[in-house]
Amino acid sequence: MDPISFKYIAIAFMAFGMAGAALGVASIFNALMNSIARNPSAIEDLQKAALIGAGLAEAMGLFSFILAILLMFT
């Protein structure tokens, strides 16, 4: 195979990193909604932890996207 085709295959596999980040954020907010339904008085602490976790999960997706763009144009 041509090395350029390997590059495009690697870019396609980086989409799995973005999909994993989306699933992670969905899982975090699903757990947040279940936790708020069980204990509404702890909403402030739960929201802080969920937003930090969602930010970290989304950062992994952004890193994967940036690496895919860099690989595509180099």
UniProtKB/Swiss-Prot annotation:
Record's GO cellular component terms: plasma membrane; proton-transporting ATP synthase complex; proton-transporting two-sector ATPase complex, proton-transporting domain
Principal cellular location given in the protein's record: membrane
Membrane topology, record value: Multi-pass membrane protein
Record field: transmembrane: 9-29, 51-71
Subcellular location(s) of the protein: Cell inner membrane
UniProt keywords, alphabetically: ATP synthesis, Cell inner membrane, Cell membrane, CF(0), Hydrogen ion transport, Ion transport, Lipid-binding, Membrane, Transmembrane, Transmembrane helix, Transport
InterPro entries recorded: ATP_synth_F0_csu, ATP_synth_F0_csu_DDCD_BS, ATP_synth_F0_csu_sf, ATPase_proteolipid_c-like_dom, F/V-ATP_Csub_sf
Site (Reversibly protonated during proton transport): E58
Keyword Lipid metabolism appears in the UniProt entry: no
GO molecular function terms attached to this record: lipid binding; proton-transporting ATP synthase activity, rotational mechanism
Family: Belongs to the ATPase C chain family.
Quaternary structure annotation from Swiss-Prot or TrEMBL: F-type ATPases have 2 components, F(1) - the catalytic core - and F(0) - the membrane proton channel. F(1) has five subunits: alpha(3), beta(3), gamma(1), delta(1), epsilon(1). F(0) has three main subunits: a(1), b(2) and c(10-14). The alpha and beta chains form an alternating ring which encloses part of the gamma chain. F(1) is attached to F(0) by a central stalk formed by the gamma and epsilon chains, while a peripheral stalk is formed by the delta and b chains.
HAMAP family: ATP_synth_c_bact
Record function comment: F(1)F(0) ATP synthase produces ATP from ADP in the presence of a proton or sodium gradient. F-type ATPases consist of two structural domains, F(1) containing the extramembraneous catalytic core and F(0) containing the membrane proton channel, linked together by a central stalk and a peripheral stalk. During catalysis, ATP synthesis in the catalytic domain of F(1) is coupled via a rotary mechanism of the central stalk subunits to proton translocation. Key component of the F(0) channel; it plays a direct role in translocation across the membrane. A homomeric c-ring of between 10-14 subunits forms the central stalk rotor element with the F(1) delta and epsilon subunits.
Protein name, UniProt field: ATP synthase subunit c
Organism: Orientia tsutsugamushi (strain Boryong)
